[in-house]
């Protein structure tokens, strides 16, 4: 279970992190907050949670090596690149994050908009084996939900050799849609952080994950 700190301010993000950090496996410095406050967010999260995996959700499109180094030196283990970034950008990001974080360092590819399985094979060939499948916030607001076409794409990526995380409008009740699919990580943001009891919401997510996947 990964919590996404989808906040616009540092105080809100840190307050949410403290409320649920011990209940989740991975803590994500969200894109909007990183744009507001920079990689300082990763540094604060690392100081609060020295043993957790910290993700910088930069959605990096260019300058991969520089962006990855800047976040990794602040404590990020994983960083995201957008799927339309060039292979050299992704490779530079991977090299930089591994230089700082060792084997713990990884790049995740964010699947937004148009992408192909042919491109995905190039990411694997470049040494990147994590992908994040989205239902975007805007798509969800437009009324789209998780369907068979999404699940089939997730399954194909897994069959190719990716560890696939899923995100977008997830709650405890939607987890069962993925039964039988070897999802790597479920990423939830406001579904956890804006709950009346965030820690309880995180525990409910984890209980349902354990119930379905054991």
Predicted regions and their residues:
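Hydrophobic faces of well-ordered beta-strands that scaffold small-molecule active sites
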Residues: 1-5, 27-29, 54-58, 79-81, ...
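Short, small-residue-enriched loops and turns at beta-alpha junctions
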Residues: 7-11, 31-36, 60-63, 85-88, ...
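A C-terminal functional module that forms or caps the active site or interfaces directly
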Residues: 148-181, 185-192
């Amino acid at each position: 279970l990964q919590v996404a700190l989808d906040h616009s301010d540092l105080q809100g993000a840190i307050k949410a992190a403290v409320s649920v950090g011990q209940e989740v496996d991975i803590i994500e410095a969200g894109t909007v907050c990183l744009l507001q406050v920079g990689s300082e967010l990763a540094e604060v999260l690392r100081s609060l949670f020295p043993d957790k995996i910290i993700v910088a959700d930069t959605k990096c499109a260019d300058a991969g090596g520089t962006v990855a180094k800047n976040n990794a030196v602040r404590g990020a283990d994983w960083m995201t690149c957008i799927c339309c970034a060039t292979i050299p950008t992704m490779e530079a990001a991977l090299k930089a994050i591994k230089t700082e974080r060792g084997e713990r360092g990884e790049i995740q590819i964010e699947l937004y908009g148009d992408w192909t399985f042919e491109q995905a094979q190039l990411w694997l060939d470049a040494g990147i084996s994590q992908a994040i499948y989205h239902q975007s916030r805007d798509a969800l607001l437009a009324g789209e939900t998780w369907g068979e076409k999404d699940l089939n794409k997730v399954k194909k990526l897994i069959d190719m050799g990716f560890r696939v995380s899923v995100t977008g409008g997830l709650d405890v009740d939607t987890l069962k849609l993925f039964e039988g699919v070897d999802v790597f990580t479920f990423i939830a943001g406001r579904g956890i952080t804006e709950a009346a009891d965030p820690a309880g919401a995180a525990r409910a997510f984890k209980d349902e994950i354990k119930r379905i996947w054991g």
